[in-house]
């Protein structure tokens, strides 16, 4: 399955007691299908993967594959700090039916660029799934350079990158690597429209958890080079882009999800949204239904 358009980095709904919320998860999956997204990511950073048990990981991924697998890509977050553990997690995701592995650069250990090349080649060779690279140095402490991506893009089982550095120069460098076999995806909602107009394939979004139709519309218009309409939609979504960054992801978007009846809480060490941001959350939540309705016209 091709990787393009809007892909939602799914949050993981929890109940008030901290347990998984299977009903909330099904409602979130339904919302994404209704919004026409082109793919989803299960158990990535937005999904609080670091807090999930193996059994919870399996439950989330298996139920997502059962509900929407075969229609759109179901990517699984499988990146861990060690190569052997990342391979093991990727094989686990493959056995559960994921279409791709989204593999973040190894957090905390700060490998060299040569180390990244060796790491990703090993995962691509042994993990059993097509690999999508994921660069988010603000979270991992490791910045994968475009030259490193260029070397990895030649591997037949490395099929794309999620680049969360919203720098224009970085996007331009990665555009040179884009091909039918290698997708370039933005991981930054706020700069995605501009990047898609420049030629990248799509967006892996946080805000689309609550506004799948609206973010899909923005991405489609950007890909069609309808500049005026793209600017209009990007402007409507700008308050959501900004709000999702007022505290570490996924705290803000989970506050919005809670306000539309999906999920209740986060897991430590993340805390609920600070009270100072509650008025903004209430205001934005009140706009969600109208924006989703408008996106279908």
From Swiss-Prot:
Biological pathway: Amino-acid biosynthesis; L-lysine biosynthesis via DAP pathway; (S)-tetrahydrodipicolinate from L-aspartate: step 3/4
GO biological-process terms attached to the record: diaminopimelate biosynthetic process; lysine biosynthetic process via diaminopimelate
Top-level taxon in the UniProt lineage: Bacteria
Membrane among keywords: no
Catalytic activities: L-aspartate 4-semialdehyde + pyruvate = (2S,4S)-4-hydroxy-2,3,4,5-tetrahydrodipicolinate + H2O + H(+)
UniProt xrefs under InterPro entries: Aldolase_TIM (IPR013785), DapA (IPR005263), DapA-like (IPR002220), Schiff_base-form_aldolases_AS (IPR020625), Schiff_base-form_aldolases_CS (IPR020624)
Stretches of the chain forming a coiled coil according to its record: none
Compartments where located: Cytoplasm
Pfam family, one: DHDPS
GO molecular function: 4-hydroxy-tetrahydrodipicolinate synthase activity
EC number, as in UniProt: 4.3.3.7
Entry function: Catalyzes the condensation of (S)-aspartate-beta-semialdehyde [(S)-ASA] and pyruvate to 4-hydroxy-tetrahydrodipicolinate (HTPA).
Family annotation (HAMAP family): DapA
NCBIfam families linked: dapA (TIGR00674)
Quaternary assembly: Homotetramer; dimer of dimers.
Protein family: Belongs to the DapA family.
Entry protein name: 4-hydroxy-tetrahydrodipicolinate synthase
